[in-house]
Amino acid sequence: MSILYEERLDGALPDVDRTSVLMALREHVPGLEILHTDEEIIPYECDGLSAYRTRPLLVVLPKQMEQVTAILAVCHRLRVPVVTRGAGTGLSGGALPLEKGVLLVMARFKEILDINPVGRRARVQPDRKSVV
């Protein structure tokens, strides 16, 4: 049982083979950094709420939006759930991974895309930190 996913209520997740998902991502998403060993994955088993921990099947760290699109396409085709994570600093458990899922880490997306000082708005990528 996971704090975020209860099979009795949400339905069973399909059983997936780590190696099959790893090979499909390597084949369809060139240049993607994929973490798959326990040593690599352990730091991603929780966010800032460290009371709850779940190791994901794989952790992927894309550098380009095209890679994100390809990751989601592969995971959809293989019926593998995806949890998206920024810097992992949240304290609500919103980025806790699923044991049978891929953790999509968006920490490399830090750009400011647009600033509208008149409208007091900014459009930024997911891991852009505010500077006051």
Mark where each language-model region is:
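Noncatalytic alpha-helical scaffold of FAD-dependent oxidoreductases
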Residues: 1-85, 90-132
